Amino acid sequence: NFILVGPQNGLYKPANMYGQGTPIVRIDGFKSGDIIDNKEFKRLSLEESDIEKYKLNKFDLVINRVNSPEYIGKTALIRNLEESTVFESNMMRFAVDTSKLDTYYLLFFLKQQFVLNQIANKRKDAVNQSSINQQDVKSLIINVPPIELQITFSNFFQKLEKNRNLFNQQALNFDNLFKALQNQAFNGTL
């Protein structure tokens, strides 16, 4: 077992606690395979003890534990958070032994059909929602190549992610420029 911390269920607070205070990662705040850096998260008022208990750390992974069946197992990697940030109750967080299992490799692997099939077989279905528990996460079979190969893959994955983000930004800039030119052309100001 490569898990050092957790899996730990997240924090539940009623809606009237939201609005200001500590940032909280919610299940609607990421897509499967996301790397979570600083974002605009919702905030809620918490006691310091809750912040300490549910605080996300660099290289933690969060996994969706309660949702509609197609979203069970949605996973993200915590990378750089500038302030203490917690996570909500319908997800779990865990940390792995990074001397044996690279977190970027694991993030990629957890999105593969092999793992998603395991999660589908373990989930408990109820009316309009499904769930997995800590033991289900601990029992996932993970293919673990030597750490050197994982790191090589991780470096490639991170470069690919950086290039993808750059491409997406350039595509957005192109779209904005095209819309501006189109607007000028139709207004006769070109």
Kindly label every feature range from the protein language model.
Residues 83-92, 101-104, 119, 123-151:
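A short glycine-rich beta-alpha junction/loop motif
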Residues 30-33, 69, 116:
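Active-site/binding-pocket entry motifs
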Residues 1-16, 28-61, 81:
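Sequence-specific dsDNA recognition surfaces
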Residues 8-9, 115, 124, 190:
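Generic structural signal for secondary-structure transition and capping sites
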Residues 1-9, 139, 143-151, 158-184, ...:
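Non-catalytic DNA-recognition/assembly elements of restriction-modification systems
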Residues 26-27, 51-111, 131-133:
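A short beta-sheet element
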